[in-house]
Every structure is written in structure tokens, then in C-alpha cells.
């Protein structure tokens, strides 16, 4: 019941969801079902970047991001998507208590606008991070790169309330589904 209260509070605080929701996955060819080793893919990206340069050395390469919804902490996202021009990669991490213990989920997607933020609503901490390099939106516990532990990045603790609200709602609903399956 506490999670339902958090969902209602998130709706009141953030207004109606809309902008920044996860994008529909593009064609199956964008999916990545291979092992965690991306060496071959990295070589393809370098070749693609070289062929997509505009006169003057400017690049028109589309950003590639992981795209998954509400995965538990121990699962990796293997789906990828080419973002539209001007989009960024986003990672949302939610830590909250459920009847069965601590639940951590992560969601990743392309979005038109992203500003890093960390908020706590009804005991659930939500952290959104943004990045602009290919396949950069992995949770910090799955990344070999050192990341800002606060999740604030250069943008500071501000963010689009619609984006955070929609993402928080998505993660809380996933948690409710996990709790509902275990009730007597």
C-alpha cells in the first residue's frame, strides 16, 4: 500500500507523464543479443563514424543507447537503439523498500532532453543520469568507467519533472507487480 501512495504522490508532484518516456524500440536489427563483449561493435562504430563525417570534419553519427525498462539490478540490458538527432542517453535507477526487501531497478532509453537529478519520494530514491556517447547509459555497478556517484553530473540537481515523474511511475509500477505476485 505504501508503494501505491508513492505512485499517487509522484503523479501529484510531477504532473502528467509525457515527455521523455522510453522510446519504442526500432527495428530488430538495432537489437543486440550478443555477449557482453562489444569489441566487434566498437570497430563497426568507428568505421561508421568515419563514413558519416560531413565536410569540415563535423560528424552526423546518431547516438546509440541501451533501451530497457525496469530491469532488476542483477540483469543487464542487451537491447540497443539508434537515437534521433539531438537526443541523449538516459539511465534511471530506483532504490526502494518493498515487503520482500530492498528493490533496485534500472531503466535506459533515448530522450529529447535530459537533466541529471536525484530525488527521494516515499522512501524510494530515484537517480537519473545523462550521457552523450555511444552505449554510455549503463548502471554504475555494470560500468568499468568511474562515474559521478551523486548522479548530478555537470547539470546539477535539476531535471524535467515530467521525465522524472514518468520514469518514477514506471519503476514503481514494476515494483508493485513484483510485490503483487508474492502476496498470499
Curated annotation (Swiss-Prot):
Known outcome of mutating residue 65 to S: In HLPP1D; does not affect protein expression at the cell surface; does not interact with LPL; promotes formation of dimers and oligomers severely reducing number of monomers
* Result when mutating residue 91 to A: Promotes formation of dimers and oligomers reducing number of monomers
**What is known to happen upon mutating residue 68 to R?**
In HLPP1D; uncertain significance; results in decreased GPIHBP1 expression; promotes formation of dimers and oligomers severely reducing number of monomers; does not affect interaction with LPL when associated in cis with F-14
Propiece span(s)? 152-184
So what does mutating residue 89 to F actually do?
A: In HLPP1D; drastically affects interaction with LPL; promotes formation of dimers and oligomers reducing number of monomers
User: What happens on changing residue 38 to F?
Assistant: Loss of sulfotyrosine formation
At which residues does the record annotate a lipid attachment of kind GPI-anchor amidated glycine? 151
Please name the GO terms that the record assigns under molecular function: chylomicron binding; lipase binding; lipid binding; lipoprotein lipase activator activity; lipoprotein particle binding; protein transporter activity
Q: Which residue windows does the record flag with biased composition (Acidic residues)?
A: 24-50
GO cellular component terms attached to this protein's record: apical plasma membrane; basolateral plasma membrane; catalytic complex; external side of plasma membrane; extracellular region; plasma membrane
Result after altering residue 92 to A:
Only slightly increased formation of dimers and oligomers. No effect on number of monomers. Loss of LPL interaction
User: Positions modified as Sulfotyrosine?
Assistant: 38
Where mainly found? membrane
Q: What is the effect of changing residue 175 to R?
A: In HLPP1D; affects protein expression at the cell surface; reduces interaction with LPL
Which residue ranges does the record annotate as region Important for interaction with LPL?
A: 103-109
Residue ranges for the region (Disordered) are 21-35
Give every UPAR/Ly6 domain span: 63-148
What are the recorded Gene Ontology BP terms?
A: cholesterol homeostasis; intracellular protein transport; positive regulation of chylomicron remnant clearance; positive regulation of chylomicron remodeling; positive regulation of fatty acid biosynthetic process; protein import; protein localization to cell surface; protein stabilization
Q: Which disease is it linked to?
A: Hyperlipoproteinemia 1D: An autosomal recessive disorder characterized by hyperlipoproteinemia, decreased plasma LPL levels in some patients, high plasma triglyceride levels, and refractory fasting chylomicronemia.
User: What's the entry's take on its domains?
Assistant: The N-terminal acidic region is intrinsically disordered. This region contributes to LPL binding, stabilizes LPL and protects LPL against loss of activity.
State the protein's purpose: Mediates the transport of lipoprotein lipase LPL from the basolateral to the apical surface of endothelial cells in capillaries. Anchors LPL on the surface of endothelial cells in the lumen of blood capillaries. Protects LPL against loss of activity, and against ANGPTL4-mediated unfolding. Thereby, plays an important role in lipolytic processing of chylomicrons by LPL, triglyceride metabolism and lipid homeostasis. Binds chylomicrons and phospholipid particles that contain APOA5. Binds high-density lipoprotein (HDL) and plays a role in the uptake of lipids from HDL.
Name used for this protein in its record: Glycosylphosphatidylinositol-anchored high density lipoprotein-binding protein 1
Q: Which organism is it from?
A: Homo sapiens (Human)
Report the gene name.
GPIHBP1
Amino acid at each position: 500500500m505504501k508503494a501505491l501512495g508513492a505512485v499517487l504522490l509522484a503523479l501529484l508532484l510531477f504532473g502528467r507523464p509525457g515527455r521523455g518516456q522510453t522510446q519504442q524500440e526500432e527495428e530488430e536489427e538495432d537489437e543486440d543479443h550478443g555477449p557482453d563483449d562489444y569489441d566487434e561493435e566498437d570497430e563497426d562504430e568507428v568505421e561508421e563514424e568515419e563514413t558519416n563525417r560531413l565536410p569540415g570534419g563535423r560528424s552526423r553519427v546518431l547516438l546509440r543507447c541501451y533501451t530497457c525498462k525496469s530491469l532488476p539490478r542483477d540483469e543487464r540490458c542487451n537491447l540497443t537503439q539508434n537515437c534521433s538527432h539531438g537526443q541523449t542517453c538516459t539511465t534511471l535507477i530506483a532504490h526502494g523498500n518493498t515487503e520482500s526487501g530492498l528493490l533496485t531497478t534500472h531503466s535506459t532509453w533515448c530522450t529529447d532532453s535530459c537533466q541529471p537529478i536525484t530525488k527521494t519520494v516515499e522512501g524510494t530514491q530515484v537517480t537519473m543520469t545523462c550521457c552523450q556517447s555511444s552505449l554510455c547509459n549503463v548502471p554504475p555497478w555494470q560500468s568499468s568507467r568511474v562515474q559521478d556517484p551523486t548522479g548530478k553530473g555537470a547539470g546539477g540537481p535539476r531535471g524535467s519533472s515530467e521525465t522524472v515523474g514518468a520514469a518514477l511511475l514506471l519503476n514503481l509500477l514494476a515494483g508493485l507487480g513484483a510485490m503483487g505476485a508474492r502476496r498470499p
